Amino acid sequence: MAGAYDPSLPEVPEWLNKGDNAWQLTAATLVGLQSMPGLVILYASIVKKKWAVNSAFMALYAFAAVLLCWVLLCYKMAFGEELLPFWGKGGPAFDQGYLKGQAKIPNSNVAAPYFPMATLVYFQFTFAAITTILVAGSVLGRMNIKAWMAFVPLWLIFSYTVGAYSIWGGGFLYQWGVIDYSGGYVIHLSSGVAGFVAAYWVGPRPKADRERFPPNNVLLMLAGAGLLWMGWSGFNGGAPYAANLTSSIAVLNTNLSAATSLLVWTTLDVIFFGKPSVIGAIQGMVTGLAGVTPGAGLIQTWAAIIIGVVSGTAPWASMMIIHKKSALLQKVDDTLAVFYTHAVAGLLGGIMTGLFAHPDLCVLVLPLPATRGAFYGGNGGKQLLKQLAGAAFIAVWNVVSTTIILLAIRVFIPLRMAEEELGIGDDAAHGEEAYALWGDGEKFDATRHVQQFERDQEAAHPSYVHGARGVTIVL
């Protein structure tokens, strides 16, 4: 009697490698868990209490919206046949004949993976989703949720797919030899730059929120960060499209860089501020992960440690020192410092990949022969220049495309919540609160239209008192 896994069965074609398919689906699930529930939890807990529901919902909505757009149009824009040197021909990816066939990327010379196209479509969706959710981190606490709902599909179509096709889908940067092993440019540089631009156009949070924006639940924040870290093994381990040597090296290098960067960031906090910070440790973790992503499977382990050190130092300095000296950086209110933790770290990681990419590891993954980092001589100097040029293209495209998208949305929908809603938060935006505690005193009445000066008068002559344990009692 034929077994359940008999190769002759149509469900198990001859080209299917069950180990590769199982690992790729596992990696996709790990990356998906980074967003759902990882970033949902992290965003909900790292913000001020009144923005917990709104922040979580922005991530939740993006995850769902990206999946639908991805299958209907965007997968083929990023990994389909060429339309332009930086863009693929869009189209639906839900035909069963297409999804059951062997995975392939038409315009690249990557060996066809030994799993179905359905696996590849879903795996790449999880990357598109987390990139879009990262952009949200820059505008938490003031962006109009309706504007965000319009922004997500437009940014996915006109920004993300361009970077993905250009570098991963066989576009001009791929053919030229720019290295981005698993998304230092496509994901982290693009989301950081786009988030910064979005924060500029949406405008800053209210002054009270900018001056005091404590996390509402540090322990949940750590839980979300933990899911993000552990999920990164699928993020970088799944990039080779196989359960092979490169994936093993990538997983080890990923975790080593994250640990190193976290410890470096924490050490700097202790040296300069006298005590370690949980938020700082999480930021260091993220910069280490983002920094190693462009070359995780292409560098030796000692290089991963160096990348961790640089990723824990340079973004810290840019956030703590350069930010305070730049009028532009101070003007733009990047709520979760996505520009520093993702754009700066991703850029540095791409540059360091141009230095440390090992030729013996590059030959296992990359399209061009004799690819190597500058540290190994040969044509490594040219590789470093390619890395810089690739970063410039991704950054400029995201500045232009994100600006155009937001200005177009602004014609129809305000990018920013009304001032009264900004003072109230979740209850105004969603009619829901994260913690339904009696006496919080932040209730939205849609029939009232209180101007800012009236709220200032209320603050001067409050109609409430603080009871035991800080509970606000409305009089």
Swiss-Prot record:
It is a multi-pass membrane protein. One of its GO terms (cellular component) is plasmodesma. Induction: By nitrogen deprivation in roots. Its main location: membrane. InterPro entries: Ammonium/urea_transptr (IPR029020), Ammonium_transpt (IPR001905), Ammonium_transpt_CS (IPR018047), NH4_transpt_AmtB-like_dom (IPR024041), RhesusRHD (IPR002229). Pfam families: Ammonium_transp. GO terms for molecular function: ammonium channel activity. GO terms for biological process: response to nematode. Keywords: Ammonia transport, Cell membrane, Membrane, Transmembrane, Transmembrane helix, Transport. Higher expression in shoots than roots. The chain crosses the membrane at residues 27-47, 55-75, 120-140, 148-168, 183-203, 218-238, 254-274, 279-299, 302-322, 336-356, 389-409. It is found in: Cell membrane. It comes from the Eukaryota. Belongs to the ammonia transporter channel (TC 1.A.11.2) family. NCBIfam families: amt. High affinity ammonium transporter that may play an important role in moving ammonium between the apoplast and symplast of cells throughout the plant. Does not transport methylammonium. This is Ammonium transporter 2. It comes from Arabidopsis thaliana (Mouse-ear cress). The lineage of its organism: Eukaryota, Viridiplantae, Streptophyta, Embryophyta, Tracheophyta. The gene is AMT2.
